[in-house]
């Protein structure tokens, strides 16, 4: 049986003016496998398409993998969300598979510590 650390860690995403526009979080921490899931939400629509998401994901991934004893971070994004997939690729994440959940197809992506 595998146990995961359900505690999540959140980081605020701010624009150049210091206004909070979203969050990056990691969760589903599995120390035995050396991995955690990472996600992002940029809620301020006027901040979309300006690179905040990819910059925040790249910064968070590098920070987490250099300060927490993990080998990789992974994420899931809906297969039709090509905008998010491009942002994650720009941040250094690489697609490695797909999965289905509740009738939806997800693209699986990862960022490994050895890529730092």
What does each model-identified segment do?
Residues 10, 15-116:
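Acyl-donor (CoA/ACP) binding surface of acyl/acetyltransferases
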């Amino acid at each position: 049986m595998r146990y995961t650390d359900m505690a999540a860690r959140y980081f605020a995403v701010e624009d150049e003016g210091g206004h909070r526009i979203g969050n990056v979080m990691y969760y589903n921490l599995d120390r035995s496998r050396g991995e955690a899931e990472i996600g992002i939400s940029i809620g301020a629509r006027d901040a979309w398409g300006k690179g905040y998401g990819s910059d925040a994901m790249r910064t968070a991934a590098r920070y987490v993998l250099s300060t927490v004893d993990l080998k990789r971070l992974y994420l899931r994004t809906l297969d039709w969300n090509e905008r998010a997939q491009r942002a994650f690729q720009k941040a250094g994440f690489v697609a490695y598979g797909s999965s289905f959940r509740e009738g939806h197809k997800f693209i699986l992506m990862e960022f490994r510590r050895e890529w730092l």
